[in-house]
Amino acid sequence: MDHHSKAKELLQQRDELDGKIKELMLVLETNNSTMDSPLLDAEGYPLNTIDVYAVRHARHDLICLRNDRAALTEKIVVEMENENKEVSGQTATSEEKPVHRTSNEPFVKISSVVELSPADIGGFRKDDLIIQYGNLHHGNFNDMQEVAQITKQSEDKIIRVTVIRENRPVRLEICPKKWSGPGLLGCNIVPISGANV
């Protein structure tokens, strides 16, 4: 199987995972719950306003599926990069063209992520250090307006992001979109200097 076919197959698998994740998120929303909201009352008894078993089961499955999705995304990126290497003389689209970073030095970080937001679904985690955001990296980054501009221009499109998490690079695909919360991502991105914008 060539790299293009393999990437297409992996994308289909990820779409199936996204469908399952959406169903599990609906279970949490129906029960007015999040990934870490309390399931017990002040006296230690299960809350009678939610389906405690369903919420616990959904949380467990969401953790597993998100890990599976992250692993699939890593494989997809590798296959697409290998495909680009094999195709000579063909102009890659702006979304497919690999960005050549001058270093792996982070320039912004994630200070908070709202649960069930596009950022959360895409795999952003609090304290992730971003070394690539679309075509932005430490070597060409000037200010946070560039991050905001890329996000706005990429509504309902994929932004390829590489973060440092637990001292290793993790590749993600983030899709900014309108959702029930504010903004298109549902996370707070700040400069490494710590100045919030």
UniProtKB/Swiss-Prot annotation:
The keyword Chaperone applies. GO terms for cellular component: cytoplasm; nucleus. The keyword Manganese does not apply. One of its GO terms (biological process) is proteasome regulatory particle assembly. It holds the Pfam family Nas2_N. Gene3D superfamilies: 2.30.42.10, 6.10.140.1710. Keywords: Chaperone. Residues 75-166 form the PDZ domain. Acts as a chaperone during the assembly of the 26S proteasome, specifically of the base subcomplex of the 19S regulatory complex (RC). Belongs to the proteasome subunit p27 family. This is Probable 26S proteasome non-ATPase regulatory subunit 9.
